């Protein structure tokens, strides 16, 4: 342990840190050179003052540098949310990832176990027969052979173990609640990313731009969900190739889809969510299907595989109804269970 973090704690409480200062601070955290009290003091100093884009980018860049990286094919994208919205919805981003892969876009999905629902991405995929506790080599094989791979966050970010006990003791949101979607181990340049707060979508989009992303949509639903919602309007901060961020609103009708009540997309246990996931892949009409079609359409636009949301919905529906999305699940399950 050292006292290297101490001056940065005081600085963080008084003013915004430069990116270099913030990188130094997070390097100290991730290398285990700070005490639990120092870690807690630093994280709460940031939270109380309010984190900046430079601080988000610094934390994410250090995490990326220390992760167990995955080599992904060019053009791969991530479809992920921060979690933490407290809404307990069905596994929309997880299902969306396989539908998008079934439409021909490589998806390197980063995720974890449940945070805001009874069933997070890893919980759902485990129920679907995948072994989520695999390392980079298996993920790379899945990406190469199946066109989609799942990266379980703790398997790729071991340095985070230095801060986990303090995070648990603090029991409140910190900068780490948004770092997951910013630290994809495959270094993807395109993202459809949900946030638990509308206030986060623009700074997160700016952060991804600072980290080198080419195109990303950061989204938040008006019902509080961390994805494009099928229940009403969603807000989007769209990062363009030139680094600009454009604010947009998206309604289900923009994609030719109906509006559904929130109750129709509420999830349950991992087993219940997996049953709904399987029904969706089998072609069952539902609010869940429409929510996935909307998010898949957006992802396909971000990937430049579709030019409009309406075109994206058609591609996503074909992915489901042709069985392509279901075959992606089967392929990844076989690859991950063979290890």
UniProtKB/Swiss-Prot annotation:
Its cofactor is Mg(2+). Anthranilate 1 binds at residues 81, 112. 5-phospho-alpha-D-ribose 1-diphosphate binds at residues 81, 84-85, 89, 91-94, 109-117, 121. Binds 2 magnesium ions per monomer. The keyword Magnesium applies. Mg(2+) 2 binds at residues 226-227. Disulfide bonds: none annotated. Belongs to the anthranilate phosphoribosyltransferase family. This is Anthranilate phosphoribosyltransferase. Keywords: Amino-acid biosynthesis, Aromatic amino acid biosynthesis, Glycosyltransferase, Magnesium, Metal-binding, Transferase, Tryptophan biosynthesis. Pathway: Amino-acid biosynthesis; L-tryptophan biosynthesis; L-tryptophan from chorismate: step 2/5. Anthranilate 2 binds at residue 167. Homodimer. GO terms for molecular function: anthranilate phosphoribosyltransferase activity; magnesium ion binding. One of its GO terms (biological process) is L-tryptophan biosynthetic process. It comes from the Bacteria. It catalyses: N-(5-phospho-beta-D-ribosyl)anthranilate + diphosphate = 5-phospho-alpha-D-ribose 1-diphosphate + anthranilate. Catalyzes the transfer of the phosphoribosyl group of 5-phosphorylribose-1-pyrophosphate (PRPP) to anthranilate to yield N-(5'-phosphoribosyl)-anthranilate (PRA). Pfam families: Glycos_trans_3N, Glycos_transf_3. It comes from Roseobacter denitrificans (strain ATCC 33942 / OCh 114) (Erythrobacter sp. (strain OCh 114)). The lineage of its organism: Bacteria, Pseudomonadati, Pseudomonadota, Alphaproteobacteria, Rhodobacterales.
């Amino acid at each position: 342990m050292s006292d290297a973090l101490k001056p940065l704690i005081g600085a963080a409480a008084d003013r915004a840190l430069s990116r270099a200062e913030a990188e130094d601070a997070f390097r100290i955290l991730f290398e285990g050179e700070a005490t639990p009290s120092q870690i807690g003091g630093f994280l709460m100093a940031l939270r109380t003052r309010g984190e900046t884009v430079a601080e988000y980018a610094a934390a994410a860049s250090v995490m990326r540098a220390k992760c167990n990286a995955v080599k992904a094919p060019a053009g791969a994208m991530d479809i992920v949310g921060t979690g933490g919205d407290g809404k307990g919805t069905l596994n929309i981003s997880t299902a969306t990832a396989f539908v998008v892969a079934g439409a021909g876009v490589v998806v390197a999905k980063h995720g974890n176990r449940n945070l805001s629902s009874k069933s997070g991405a890893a919980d759902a995929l485990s129920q679907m027969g995948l072994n989520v506790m695999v390392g980079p080599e298996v993920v790379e094989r899945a990406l190469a052979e199946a066109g989609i791979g799942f990266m379980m966050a703790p398997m790729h970010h071991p340095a985070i173990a230095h801060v986990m006990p303090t995070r648990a003791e603090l029991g409140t949101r910190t900068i780490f609640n948004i770092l997951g979607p910013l630290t994809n181990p495959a270094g993807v340049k395109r993202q459809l990313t949900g946030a638990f707060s509308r206030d986060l979508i623009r700074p997160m989009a700016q952060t991804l731009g600072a980290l080198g992303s080419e195109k990303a949509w950061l989204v938040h639903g008006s019902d509080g969900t961390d994805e494009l919602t099928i229940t009403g309007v969603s807000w989007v901060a769209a990062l363009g190739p030139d680094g600009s961020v454009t604010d947009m609103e998206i309604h289900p009708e923009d994609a030719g889809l109906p509006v559904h009540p929130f109750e129709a997309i509420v999830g349950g246990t991992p087993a219940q969510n997996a049953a709904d996931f399987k029904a969706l892949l089998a072609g069952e009409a539902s609010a869940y299907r429409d929510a996935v079609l909307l998010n898949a359409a957006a992802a396909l636009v971000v990937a430049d595989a579709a030019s409009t949301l309406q075109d994206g919905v058609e591609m996503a529906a074909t992915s489901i109804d042709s069985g392509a999305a279901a075959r992606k699940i089967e392929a990844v399950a076989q690859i991950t269970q063979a290890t």
